[in-house]
Amino acid sequence: MNDFTPKFRIGNGYDIHRLVTGRKLIIGGVNLKHPDNLGLDGHSDADVLTHSIMDALLGALSLGDIGKYFPPSDDKWKDVDSLILLSKVIDLVRKQGWEINNIDSVLVAERPKIKPFVEIMKKNLSNTLKIDNSFIGIKATTNEKLGPEGREEGISCHSVVLLEKKE
């Protein structure tokens, strides 16, 4: 074991939730309207974008995943706004002396169209994380009718974060 402390850490996050009736469709803190009135199933609000960012942040510091901190077995987190959870995760990251350098996320969904809401999502995330929204990249794509996202069974998100050690 050496005494080397890296200046940067990279984290990768992924989340997917099933589309169901009777639930809201919250992505990046934005309540979207699905053409078939579907929403994402989950214990919290099932915000795949916010969940994948949280997992990337935790993973960058080898702190486990969001289930460790907000287990679905705990009713305290039932239907909670994921931006509240994100604020708890970023507090943990900062207590360890790290800051976000940037975030890059890719949402995968056939419908609804995500692009018109990207700037609002970035604003919600940047306000929660207390970073400039230029540090956050959000892209949306389809799966070309392939896989669970392509069959409109669910929506997923991949995120990468770069953390920098504060001096």
From Swiss-Prot:
Annotated a divalent metal cation binding sites: 15, 17, 51
Pfam families attached to this UniProt entry: YgbB
Pathway stated in the Swiss-Prot or TrEMBL entry: Isoprenoid biosynthesis; isopentenyl diphosphate biosynthesis via DXP pathway; isopentenyl diphosphate from 1-deoxy-D-xylulose 5-phosphate: step 4/6
Site (Transition state stabilizer): 43, 142
Classification via PANTHER family: 2-C-METHYL-D-ERYTHRITOL 2,4-CYCLODIPHOSPHATE SYNTHASE, CHLOROPLASTIC (PTHR43181:SF1)
Protein's UniProt name: 2-C-methyl-D-erythritol 2,4-cyclodiphosphate synthase
PROSITE patterns xref list: ISPF (PS01350)
Presence of the UniProt keyword Kinase in the record: no
Textual note on the cofactor: Binds 1 divalent metal cation per subunit.
Organism encoding this protein: Prochlorococcus marinus (strain MIT 9312)
Lineage of the organism: Bacteria, Bacillati, Cyanobacteriota, Cyanophyceae, Synechococcales
Keywords of this entry: Isoprene biosynthesis, Lyase, Metal-binding
The keyword Hydrolase is annotated on this UniProt entry: no
GO biological process: isopentenyl diphosphate biosynthetic process, methylerythritol 4-phosphate pathway; terpenoid biosynthetic process
Secretion signal span: none
Domain of life, source organism: Bacteria
